[in-house]
Amino acid sequence: DPASATSSMAIGARMGGAEIYRHTQVLDTRLKDTGEWAVVTDKGTITCEHVVNAAGSFARQVGEWVGLDLPIVNMKHHYLVTENLPEMAALDKEPPVIRDPRASCYYRQEQDGILIGPYEKSGAEAWGLDGIDWGFDMELLNPELERLETSLELAAERIPCWSEAGIKRVVHGPITHTPDGGFLLGPAEALSNYWLCCGASIGITQGPGCGKYLAQWMVHGQTEINVRDMDPRRYGKWACGDYAVAKSIDEYQEMYQPVLPGDFRDTGRPTRVTPLYDRLKELGA
C-alpha cells in the first residue's frame, strides 16, 4: 500500500524534526557563493547544505536547472484492474505477486480482483521527451490497449479467470526508465552536495532501500553495501539524448525477459568505441 507506507514515513520524519511542505512548487535550485543551495519555491526560498533530486518523472527537468543532463526517459505504462472475481474471493490468503516472462506481465491481487501490468515486448513508447508540463500532477494518459493485445492474450492463458473478467479500471501513465534499468542513487557529477535519487522503474520495492543507503552516503560518506551499480556517475554525456531513449525503450521491452549467455542487444551500439574499432570492424570482428 504505497499511500499508507508514504504517510507512515512522513510521520516518522516529522517526529525526527523534518519539515514537509505540501502543495509547494519548486521553481529553481541555485548554488550560492557560500557553497549552500538555494531552493526557490512559489512560497519562498529555502537555503540548505544538501539537495536531493527525487523528482520522479520531472527529475531530468529539475536536473537541467543545475546543468545536468540525466539519462532518464519516461515510458508509457499500463496496468489494468478487473472487477471482483469469485475465484479470488474464495481464496483464504493473498497469493504472491507473479512475474510472467512469457506474457511479460506482472499479476497481483487487488481486493477481490486481479491487477495485471504488461510490459509490451514491442511498440513501447517514450513520453514527454520535450518536457512535462509542471501542472501534470496525478494525471493519467488515455488508454492505448492495442499494443497490449499479445501480452493480455498470454495472460489469459496463464490465469483463465482473467479472460472472463470485466475491466474495472485502466491506469496509463509515465514511469521512469534508464538505459540499463538501474536507478540513479548517489552524488551528481561535479556538484557538491547535490544528490540523485531518481530514475527508478520499480518504485515501492526499491524505495525504502534507496532512502536508507542514500542517507548513509550523505551522513557518513559511504554505504554499508556496495551500490556501485546505481551510482549516477556510471553514465557520462554519451548516455543522454537519443542513446538514452533507444536503450530505455529496449530495457522496458526486455523488462521480464531472462538474460541468457551470449545475448547481444545491439540497441544503442556503437556509441563508445576504442581507436581500434574501425580497423577491427574491417577485419570482421
Q: What are the residue ranges of the model-derived segments?
A:
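Anion (oxyanion) recognition and catalysis
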Residues: R14, E64, K281
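Long, low-complexity segments enriched in small/aliphatic residues
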Residues: G268-G284
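Flavin-dependent oxidoreductases
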Residues: T29-N142, T150-R158, C240-M255, V259-D266, ...
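General beta-strand structural signal in soluble alpha/beta enzymes
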Residues: I20-R22, N53, I116, G166-K168, ...
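Hydrophobic/aromatic-lined pockets within catalytic cores
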Residues: R14, G56, G67, A215-V219, ...
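A short alpha-helix-loop-beta-strand transition element characteristic
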Residues: D69-I72, R99, G221-I225, G284
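Helical element adjacent to the flavin cofactor pocket in flavoenzyme catalytic cores
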Residues: D1-H50, F58, P208
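C-terminal catalytic lobe of FAD-dependent flavoproteins
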Residues: S8, R102, Q111, E125, ...
